[in-house]
């Protein structure tokens, strides 16, 4: 089942309301789904996300993107020949870590790094560890 925020963005009527009303608690609850370590979810971070979503056209763009038809990029991924890094949180509640394997199979020249005790946003939840993985990848390639 897809995350609540996406289900609401697809719901006729509700998605029209979401274009104009985005309560702070809604942002907070959505972020709780993507963070494994809830202690990293500060009031400042919640406010930053709310400020971003409230910017002109952002809500409309999110709803439009959520309601667009899915596209299968598998063949296009297979054509990428440069080294690619896949970083995934093993506790991602939005997109299962099993999908890292699918990306790995589609990308011919890749490295997969699975981060333990990490949710959907490794680069925010564990920025220093994410940076270390990224720099190691860059140095190796």
Regions found by a protein language model. Give the residues of each.
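Flexible "cap/lid" loop of the alpha/beta hydrolase fold
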Residues: 1-16
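Conserved alpha/beta-hydrolase catalytic His-Asp/Glu region
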Residues: 19-79
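Conserved alpha/beta-hydrolase "acid-adjacent" motif
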Residues: 42, 93-99
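Glycosyltransferase donor-binding loop in the core domain
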Residues: 54, 92-95, 119-122
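Short, conserved loop/helix-junction motifs that constitute active-site signature segments
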Residues: 78-81, 106-107
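Short beta-strand/loop motif that positions the catalytic acidic residue
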Residues: 80, 86-88, 92
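Active-site-adjacent alpha-helix of alpha/beta-hydrolase-fold enzymes
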Residues: 101-110
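Catalytic active-site module of serine/aspartate enzymes centered on a nucleophile-bearing elbow/loop
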Residues: 110-141
